[in-house]
Amino acid sequence: MQETKGQKGRGLFARAMRGSAFTAGSYVIAQVLRLGSNLILTRLLAPEAFGVMTLVSVVLVGMVMFSDVGVSASISQSKRGDDADFLNTAFTIHAFRGTMLWLATCALAWPLAQFYHAPELAWRLPVAGISLFISGFNPTRIETATRHLLLGRVTLLDLISQAIGIAAMVGLSMVLVSVWGLVIGAIVGSLAKLVLTWVYLPGPANRFHWDRTAGHELIHFGKWIFLSTACGFLLSQGDKAIFGAYLSLEELGIY
C-alpha cells in the first residue's frame, strides 16, 4: 500500500514538473512570437494604430480583471471540481460574464471615445469586445485539465491559438493596413482557442445549468481574488489608462 502511494506521489510530481516545463517553455515562445509580430506590425501600421489598440486593450483587460470572481481557481481547488453540475454552473457563469462584458464594451464605447478624444474607439471597441463574448464560452475542460495536471496539452493549445491570432493580425494588417487588422486578429485568436479547447481537451461537453449551491461556492470563493486582480490592473495597465488621456494616439502608440 505504501509503495503504491509512493509511486502515485512520484507520478504526480513528475506530471507537475513536465507541466511546469511546458508552461515556462510556452511563455518564452509566446514572447518570441509577440516580439517578432511587433517588429513586423510596426513596419505595416502607423503609430496611431497602436495607440488605438492600446486603449482598446486597456479597456478589455480592465473589464476582464475587474469582473474576475475566481471561477477558474474555484474549480481547481473545489472538492466538486469534477462534478458535472458544478462545472456546468461554472460554464453558465462564464458565458453570462462574457456576454455582459461585451454589452458593457458597447455601452462604454462612446463615453470612452469622448474621454480619450479618440473617435475611433466608438466603433472599434464594440467589435474588439466580441473576443470577450467568445472567450465566455470556453469550456471548463481547461480548468479540469489544469486540475488534473494536464498542463502540457493546455499550454500547447494556448500557444497554438496565440500563433493563429498573431498570424491573423499580421496577414490582415498587410491587407487592410489599419488597426482593424489588429482588432479582427484578436477575435480570430479567441475563436481559435475556443475551437481548439472544445475539440482537443478531454471531458464532457458543457451545457447551461444552474446549481444554487455550486453558484454560491463559485462566486463566494472569488471575492478576495477580485481585490488582487484589481490591484494587478492598476500595476500593469494604470500607466496606459492615465497617459491615454494626455498623450496623442501617435505618442501613446510609441509609448
Identify the role of each PLM range.
Residues 32, 38-64, 120-123, 217-221, ...:
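Interfacial/gating helices of multi-pass transporter permease domains
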Residues 44-47, 84, 115-118, 148, ...:
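Helix-loop interface residues and adjacent transmembrane-helix termini in multi-pass membrane transporters
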Residues 14-34, 55-56, 60-61, 65-110, ...:
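Membrane-water interface segments that mark the loop-to-transmembrane alpha-helix transition
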Residues 35, 39, 43, 66-69, ...:
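Membrane-embedded alpha-helical segments of multi-pass transporters/permeases
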Residues 122-129, 157-202, 220-221, 228, ...:
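Hydrophobic alpha-helical transmembrane segments
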Residues 27, 31, 58-61, 98, ...:
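Residue-level recognition of pore/gate-forming positions within transmembrane alpha-helices
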Residues 1-12, 16, 152, 195-236, ...:
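Interhelical loop/hinge segments that connect adjacent transmembrane helices in multipass membrane
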Residues 77-83, 134-158, 175-176, 180:
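Membrane-interface junctions at transmembrane-helix termini in multi-pass inner-membrane proteins
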